[in-house]
Amino acid sequence: MEPITIGLWVSAGMLAMVLLGMRVAFAAGLAGFIGIFWFFWDKFDYAADKIIYWNERREVWDGALGRAMQIAGSVPQSKVSANVLSLIPVFILIGYLAYHAKMTTALFEACKRWFGWVPGGLAVSTVFATAGFAAVSGASVATAAVFARIAIPEMLKVGYNKQFAAGVVAAGGTLASLIPPSAILVIYAIIVEQNVGTLLLAGFVPGAFSALVYAGIIIGMAVVFKTVGPPVGGYSWKERFESLPPALPIVAVVVILIFFVYNPFGDAWGTPTEGGAIGALIVFLMAMLKGMKWKQLKEALLETAKLTVMIF
């Protein structure tokens, strides 16, 4: 049997197990192990009608099972222990430090004042703010969790549909899967053995385009269904420009990371991990200057640890 056929059957089996209620991690692990065993059984042409004696059957079974267990035990460990994965907790820390230092709130406020006047303006502002936050966080869960606290109450306050508000935040959170420094792309780069920096950079344009598409869909829905997302007006040009300075720190971090890791004018100044470490230090210093308390720092570290453990 062709490996791709085995893969399709195993994927179908995993989907069936998930639909039957098994946890995704266990379903994926079991399906993967069965797929590896099946591959080696088929590779060495272990057909039942060719095996005459019981000891031959046992030898064949133990051989395929042994190879499957060996790979299942070594490959995940080798992938998870890759040094480049250390950038994931670093960028998650950047995101939570920015949140507890109120940088993300300032970013959302700036987006609200500039884009709130369009139909579904708060939802559009949420999408653009999540895109900006994704550029320093890299984790969809962190992005969705942060803006669920910031944006949903604001949208509900002006009469947004609850399901619509939650859907906007959930959709905005997915931008962190594309916009660098995406944790998903880091893991994918390790699996397919590609350069992490190059793959992260490749996600920037699709991520930015997705944000624009989301914004367009939101505006269209708000125009067709008037009560879904009413516009928010009343901001003067002075108020709009006044909202920019508080949002500059998080924008500055994004620019620094781009030039440090991806430098469009020459060679990169460092690796993504080094860029993340410098970004975390900069955000930490900014947070201290903005008056971050020990309790807030502790919460940022705990939330970073919890999300990192969940990802790994």
Region roles according to the model:
Residues 1-312:
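Alpha-helical transmembrane segments of multi-pass membrane transport proteins
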